Amino acid sequence: MEQRGRASQDEEQAIVGAETGSQPSLPVSPMRPIIAPSPAMVLPTPGHGMGIPQFGPVGLPAQASTPMLSSTPGPSYSSAPTPMPNPSAANLWPTYKLVAEIPNAHKKSISGIKFSPDGRYMGSGSADCSIKIWRMDFVYEKTLMGHRLGINEFSWSSDSKLIVSCSDDKLVKVFDVSSGRCVKTLKGHTNYVFCCCFNPSGTLIASGSFDETIRIWCARNGNTIFSIPGHEDPVSSVCFNRDGAYLASGSYDGIVRIWDSTTGTCVKTLIDEEHPPITHVKFSPNGKYILASNLNNTLKLWDYQKLRVLKEYTGHENSKYCVAANFSVTGGKWIVSGSEDHKVYIWNLQTREILQTLDGHNTAVMCTDCHPGQNIIASAALEPDMRIKIWRSQS
């Protein structure tokens, strides 16, 4: 039986830890919404379930010119903090405001957005088969090409030198960020590869697929170390904890599993009574808790050692698409997520109250990421929006 009582202040400190670590967040592709979240999943054809154009071929030109930045939000960009019933919490309110916008960042829907662990760059992945790198003044730097179909996920290595990506082309690729070259292609999955990440030391790569398996690869030679038939539906998200000892996986089967990364064995299984499809999982900064995004308009914070839910965050809309959530610890201790109502939501980690909503996108917000060292949030949305928005807070 899940428990939804508030965690103590000590638990909150344990959740966020003393450092943010360098794990990349793991946004999940918006390209395949869940039509019928039931034991017999009905999954739309990739790239078609939400009425977007089919993925294009390789060869889309890299953007040679710098996209225009807009630092002045229009009248519809309301970022005032949501009124709070508890005045004593006012000093904990985030004050995010729109400070920059990259229009037409990609040619198709943006499936992921990530800051590099060193905080110097931002990456964005898209259904247009490209990953673009942006400087922190949000000026275009370069494009990484190599996949034949749309990008479902990408993640940075902890030293910010490499990017691993996965695609509907059933491949996992590793790119050298400095040169922009694909340096390794990992083959083995038999269906769309939905998620991928490096372990903190950069020695392992994990991936999850619509073939219902998790693969752990040697990052040096690209060989498969483990192929794990870990779920009964597509694997939607994978994430290492901060020391790399454990790998979490989430699936449309409604289950989160924790794996020993050295043996490939399952050490914990998390499932609640409702078991809605899981679309994203992320370890807390200290690696002791897991934040799971669910296709029933909830985020759940699990104490996976005790197999219980510590917190449940609600108020946003998420019942159709794969939307990622993040921890923000550079200012207050917050949970950040996109939403199908075109907004970004920010919750107080401890009280579960919505502190602020960020308005400005005109389609479902699939991707958010929090800068590792500054109070900055990046967000991106489905077609036809295709804009990256940058929000900054003074608190």
From Swiss-Prot:
This is WD repeat-containing protein wdr-5.2. GO terms for molecular function: dynein complex binding; microtubule plus-end binding. Disulfide bonds: none annotated. GO terms for biological process: brain morphogenesis; establishment of mitotic spindle orientation; germ cell development; microtubule organizing center organization; nuclear migration; retrograde axonal transport; vesicle transport along microtubule. It comes from Caenorhabditis elegans. One of its GO terms (cellular component) is kinetochore. PANTHER family: WD REPEAT DOMAIN 5B, WD40 REPEAT PROTEIN. The lineage of its organism: Eukaryota, Metazoa, Ecdysozoa, Nematoda, Chromadorea. Sex determining protein required in the germline to promote the spermatogenesis to oogenesis switch during the late larval stages of development. Acts with the sex determining factor tra-1, and redundantly with wdr-5.1, to regulate fog-3 expression, which in turn determines germ cell fate. Not required for methylation of histone H3 'Lys-4'. Disruption phenotype: No obvious phenotype at 20 degrees Celsius or 25 degrees Celsius. At 20 and 25 degrees Celsius, double knockdown mutants with wdr-5.1 have increased fog-3 expression. At 25 degrees Celsius, these mutants have increased fog-1 expression, reduced brood size accompanied by 42% embryonic lethality with 100% of the surviving progeny being sterile. Surviving progeny display defective spermatogenesis to oogenesis transition with 88% of the gonads only containing sperm. SUPFAM superfamilies: WD40 repeat-like.
